Amino acid sequence: MERIPSAQPPPTCLPKAPGLEPGDLSGMDFAHMYQVYKSRRGIKRSEDSKETYKLPHRLIEKKRRDRINECIAQLKDLLPEHLKLTTLGHLEKAVVLELTLKHVKALTNLIDQQQQKIIALQSGLQAGDLSGRNVEAGQEMFCSGFQTCAREVLQYLAKHENTRDLKSSQLVTHLHRVVSELLQGGTSRKPSDPAPKAMDFKEKPSSLAKGSEGPGKNCVPVIQRTFAHSSGEQSGSDTDTDSGYGGESEKSELRVEQPYFKSDHGRRFTMGERISAIKQESEEPPMKKSRMQLSDDEGPFTSTDLISSPFLGPHPHQPPFCLPFYLIPPSATAYLPMLEKCWYPTSVPVLYQGLNASAAALSSFMNPDKISAPLLMPQRLPSPLPTHPAIDSSALLQALKQIPPLNLETKD
């Protein structure tokens, strides 16, 4: 312990003061020295008591801090990972406490909601009175489930209609599989769709076959006139100026027209049957040949085509063949209005060198030596006609020149 300097004896090295004897100190006052000594001793004792008090208090504080740190470390380990990822870097103690508080609040809200639902269900079951909305929802769910089940049963039966060894266990297995697919999140069908019938599955192949009978990819229908004109203009399909493609106005006109047309015999034909001429687009343009290079065998049409032509048989829905004006002499052009009005309802048939049967048939009743002028408008010839010997185009032109001109003012 620290000693007070006044209480210590003087050092031995210092010599005693001369002339100081105990008798001389009797008259001196040492009261101030006693007071100082007493006060110092009291201060020392108070400091010792404080040190003895701080020592256990520090230990207690250290233990308390250790417990707090341990609890914060455990909270950090118990926090969910998604909350830990919201912060970057090291999680401080304050951040851990904030995240813990947030997580506890979320759990408390969830528990409160579940508790409210449980109370509502218990009150509803006790009262035994369900609201009308819940009843309607239950009925809709039942109806949708029943329709889905019936649809699956019909589809399964239609698919396995021909199988004789169909068992109920197979149907039940199929329904269980469908239910599992729906529960797993598969796309459920709309309950408003009507249940398919077995006839629908039978009609599908026929409809597919009908769809495949349409025109090909590269086929474009040629635009034709569907009615015969009473004027002297050339009717039919104009292949010199027609490109095979119609504009918007022509498309709208075709949509407005009636889809059915009546023939002379009363039979109705659709637009697809009337337009039988198809122009096919090829990659390379065909080589053009002059009319003088065409032989009898290489004519534009064969005898089978002539038999099925509208001139030789009653086929009003087939496209007519037209005769260009430059092949008819001027004297014969006067007969075009009469022929177009009375003799044939459509355009004049074509006359070329390769058409042996048509040229012979036309010359047989247009020759004035055999048939008179009033008989130039006969009825339609039956198909097919007997084959006549071929004649030259010059002979045909001479026969046309010999026909006497008719009066254009004659009534039909």
Curated annotation (Swiss-Prot):
Record note on modification: Ubiquitinated; which may lead to proteasomal degradation. Sumoylation inhibits its ubiquitination and promotes its negative regulation of the CLOCK-BMAL1 heterodimer transcriptional activator activity.
Region (Disordered): 1-21, 182-256, 279-298
Subcellular location: Cytoplasm; Nucleus
InterPro entries given in the database record: bHLH_dom, HES_HEY, HLH_DNA-bd_sf, Orange_dom
Cross-link entry Glycyl lysine isopeptide (Lys-Gly) (interchain with G-Cter in SUMO1), positions: 279
Pfam families: Hairy_orange, HLH
Gene Ontology CC annotations of this record: cytoplasm; nuclear body; nucleus
Region (Necessary for interaction with RXRA and repressor activity against RXRA): 75-79
Modified residues (Phosphoserine): 235, 383
Keywords: Biological rhythms, Cytoplasm, DNA-binding, Isopeptide bond, Nucleus, Phosphoprotein, Repressor, Transcription, Transcription regulation, Ubl conjugation
Domain of life assignment: Eukaryota
Chain spans, region Essential for interaction with BMAL1, E-box binding and repressor activity against the CLOCK-BMAL1 heterodimer: 1-139
Cross-link named Glycyl lysine isopeptide (Lys-Gly) (interchain with G-Cter in SUMO2), sites: 167, 279, 288
Assembly description: Homodimer. Heterodimer with BHLHE41/DEC2. Interacts with TCF3/E47. Interacts with ubiquitin-conjugating enzyme UBE2I/UBC9. Interacts with HDAC1, SUMO1, RXRA and BMAL1.
Entry function: Transcriptional repressor involved in the regulation of the circadian rhythm by negatively regulating the activity of the clock genes and clock-controlled genes. Acts as the negative limb of a novel autoregulatory feedback loop (DEC loop) which differs from the one formed by the PER and CRY transcriptional repressors (PER/CRY loop). Both these loops are interlocked as it represses the expression of PER1/2 and in turn is repressed by PER1/2 and CRY1/2.
Protein's UniProt name: Class E basic helix-loop-helix protein 40
Organism: Bos taurus (Bovine)
Designated gene of the protein: BHLHE40
